[in-house]
């Protein structure tokens, strides 16, 4: 079991506090493993496992706990038999109706430490904000980074070079369970295909009561085909009209929002760097795991430039950056990143194979006058840094401890 120290270092300061620890992210990205890692640390610090109460609400054994009252009664009864602080671990708690009322009551009435996971961003809106506002901390969990993937892959293929590891990562992606399948191609694709269907059905269709599943599937296919490309709801509506599907742009935006709430997609807004304002349209979208894209739709090798962008974008999120697409005049910067006032600029391209490409990628920074780090990231093996702009091979960039 990989330690996932990037996340544990953020969660650790809150272990044992009264704040509710909430872990969100796409289905099967490793949230349940985070609960096990927390239990492991608690045990190592002297907490007895008899103080743990763990419930996975996708397990039929707990199908009787589908309401807040039933769950409250169950936990109260079990807590009465435990000496000392009770540690509560609730996996996929969204399956319980009005669960936030139960959690708030347990927080108030018991000496407890609460950890919950969910696969939908709606968890932290609406009713939850009403009941738990200011009393929880959220941690978004992502599929494996390249570094995490390589650690596991080399436990299966110890002689794999860093280039071979990256080539495998490019196609397989970072879903943790693939290691159990030893990253074999056919089983891995089957697993990712079924996972995609599960996200689509359980976390999007069922949760949002979508009736027009065909429309949803067409929208998802369009967004996945256009990962990392700016488009508007109006342009997508025109595309669908050509396929004999007339749909309002507002409906399209709602469906895409549902996908983002299920962590299937991430929306990246555009920022006018000269006017210092967020632009209102033509956002970009990236997929939570590029391995899902390859398994379901294929084309990662043909769309290599966009997939490299997708990989870098997710790594920026993992490391805590807020990310926008930068526009300055007629030029675009792939990623403008901010973390507590510290900025970072990143351009991603496949290869710097021509003078035209070199001028385009490095020239995107011509009007940026600040002294924050600026990178061009590609698959090139040789350092082509110039004029204070750093060039890095994508593998080295992803594995670097910090960027400065």
Predicted region positions:
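Pre-Walker A adenine-sensing motif
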Residues: 2-16
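Hydrophobic anchor at the beta1->P-loop junction of P-loop NTPases
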Residues: 23
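Conserved lysine of the Walker
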Residues: 31
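Hydrophobic positions on the alpha1 helix immediately C-terminal to the Walker A/P-loop
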Residues: 34, 38
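Short glycine-rich substrate-engagement loop in P-loop NTPases that contacts/grips substrate
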Residues: 54-84
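Interdomain motor-coupling "hinge/lid" segment immediately C-terminal to the ATP-binding subdomain
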Residues: 119-121, 126-230, 263
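Accessory nucleic acid-recognition modules appended to NTPase machines
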Residues: 183-343
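Catalytic cores of nucleic-acid endonucleases
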Residues: 326, 350-395
